[in-house]
Amino acid sequence: MKFIHISDIHLVSGDGPLNGCVPSDRLNKCIKDISKWHGDAKFCVISGDLSEYAEKGAYQSLKKKLLEFQIPCFLMIGNHDDRDLFQSVFTNNPCDENKFVQSSFETDERVFIFLDTKKQGKNVHDGELCENRLDWLQKQLINSGNKPTYLFMHHPPFDIGIPYMDNIRLFGSDQFLSTLSHGKNIQHIFYGHVHRLTFVKWHGYTFSSLTSLNHQSPLVAESVQGEFCDEPPAYGVVLIDEDQLTIHFNNFLDRKP
């Protein structure tokens, strides 16, 4: 099986600029590259921060772009998003019984679980998984049984050694870890938020993240003049078979033929 992972697209209403780039242009180029070279992917996951300012126009623009994208997409929300506004535009996007943007997708061989780590409040950037969301996750993990299971979340539950990001990670990580223990065969966990390529092994579970499509977080803050840097964006090409998981972090801009 092949699927695509994208994160942190940060669209701006009216296709406006952001931090020296144009998010809509980056997304267009990303979709074009995926369609040309990986059109056989079974699905695509966009793991949050769909919009920079949680604007209805940004969500409407994303919806229009995805109508032209032949690969089915699972959309998640992040700290820059607004849950209610997102759901008012993407009315058919699945959610759980408490209206959190959480869902699961099951094939004959595998289970994929998508989490909503958005913490309510204006300009709140750390994440949470409340009791209702953790209860839902526990049920999904129990129902998954022995099937290989893959999780997707926006915020990481651990520090990554970048103070700015460590201050806005998912808190309540002990409760999250306890909930994970109900999964019998968790293979990997994908996340976003940090705007960097990372691989982390946390309490025996492996995690990986992607760069943003628009702007990146420097590993060392003092190495750049501003808050962000212009390292290359990438999307993930994920290949799964019976006994192997491979993730290609695919830089798609300015590829020389």
Residue ranges and their predicted role:
Residues 1-13, 109-119, 150-152, 205-211, ...:
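Active-site-proximal beta-strand elements of phosphoester/diester hydrolases
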Residues 1-61, 68:
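N-terminal active-site segment of His-dependent metallophosphoesterases
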Residues 12-15, 52-57, 79-86, 120-124, ...:
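Active-site environment of divalent metal-dependent phosphoester hydrolases
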Residues 30-43, 125-206, 237, 241-246, ...:
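His/acidic metal-ligating clusters that form di-metal
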Residues 48, 77-80, 153-155, 249:
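A cross-domain feature marking catalytic cores of carbohydrate-active enzymes
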Residues 56-139, 175-185, 203, 225-240, ...:
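Extended active-site neighborhood of metal-dependent phosphoesterases/phosphodiesterases
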Residues 206, 211-257:
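Metal-dependent phosphoesterase/phosphodiesterase active-site architecture
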